């Protein structure tokens, strides 16, 4: 049987998607070869790539004045690519700091421009939270404002889209496609694929057309959004198999009823898990309710000495990858789109049994 996988990334993929990929692995649609052996410039592959983009545009309702790029290097490469693409005419940017990933992004950006860091973390009744925008010290003349919509490690998420009068840039790696989003409020959205999109190796960048001519002159051509847009994300050979698999995930999402439908399931999963944690004296979540992530749920045990046993028994119950990030410890359940409600119910049942045995 397939286990329930709570890994933060590379993460669970829908079983139906893996089964389709398995069927097509050796002989893609009767062509006598695997899609991973196919030229990225062949008519067949270009059709697969174009359909994946069209389906993503449909799922996210992406306006026509935005380019959708299928790139490589992970979201971490975008930490450099974004300032190099957007700070050519104005070297100032605001970065909102709420956790480990937004910190990595701002530290990289500091190599390329004059970065104003907004410390937006706070606490409410001892729980971590994000300050109201009225308390941020935003610049008047920034080229853009950057934030990480959902901090994968900390499990802290913005309750609203920031309202700024310059282009808004967001790392959506762990929350893309989990809830409806008004793309028109953003100048640029980026996301590593290996959480809610597909396998590792692919990175999605959605960028508004008017931002394509803002790059620095010393930018490597492979990182230049305008060049990638002009060449259909094929300045060099793209991550063809990851692109194809992501396309299968987009098809699967459309079959589920799209982002609105999957969002309802995600809310149900989060309500079930947080509800159980809050009702327990043994488990604790460190995040204030308004800023709890619906995708990444960190929690601690009342007795830290039981952590190894918890993970061991969870694995015996086919519940995998529940250890928290190495930088923070504790536990973390990542409940992305591909993790079914039954998986979260199985986790809650196990957590309850564990307390009765060891709590």
Swiss-Prot record:
It catalyses: O-phospho-L-serine + 2-oxoglutarate = 3-phosphooxypyruvate + L-glutamate; 4-(phosphooxy)-L-threonine + 2-oxoglutarate = (R)-3-hydroxy-2-oxo-4-phosphooxybutanoate + L-glutamate. One of its GO terms (biological process) is pyridoxine biosynthetic process. The modification N6-(pyridoxal phosphate)lysine is found at residue 195. Pyridoxal 5'-phosphate binds at residues 75-76, 101, 152, 171, 194, 236-237. Homodimer. InterPro entries: Aminotrans_V_dom, Aminotrans_V_PyrdxlP_BS, Pser_aminoTfrase, PyrdxlP-dep_Trfase, PyrdxlP-dep_Trfase_major, PyrdxlP-dep_Trfase_small. L-glutamate binds at residue 41. This is Phosphoserine aminotransferase. Pathway: Amino-acid biosynthesis; L-serine biosynthesis; L-serine from 3-phospho-D-glycerate: step 2/3; Cofactor biosynthesis; pyridoxine 5'-phosphate biosynthesis; pyridoxine 5'-phosphate from D-erythrose 4-phosphate: step 3/5. Its cofactor is pyridoxal 5'-phosphate. HAMAP family: SerC_aminotrans_5 (MF_00160). Catalyzes the reversible conversion of 3-phosphohydroxypyruvate to phosphoserine and of 3-hydroxy-2-oxo-4-phosphonooxybutanoate to phosphohydroxythreonine. PANTHER family: PHOSPHOSERINE AMINOTRANSFERASE. One of its GO terms (cellular component) is cytoplasm. Binds 1 pyridoxal phosphate per subunit. Its EC number is 2.6.1.52. One of its GO terms (molecular function) is pyridoxal phosphate binding. Belongs to the class-V pyridoxal-phosphate-dependent aminotransferase family. SerC subfamily. Keywords: Amino-acid biosynthesis, Aminotransferase, Cytoplasm, Pyridoxal phosphate, Pyridoxine biosynthesis, Serine biosynthesis, Transferase. Its main location: cytoplasm. It is found in: Cytoplasm. SUPFAM superfamilies: PLP-dependent transferases. The keyword Disulfide bond does not apply.
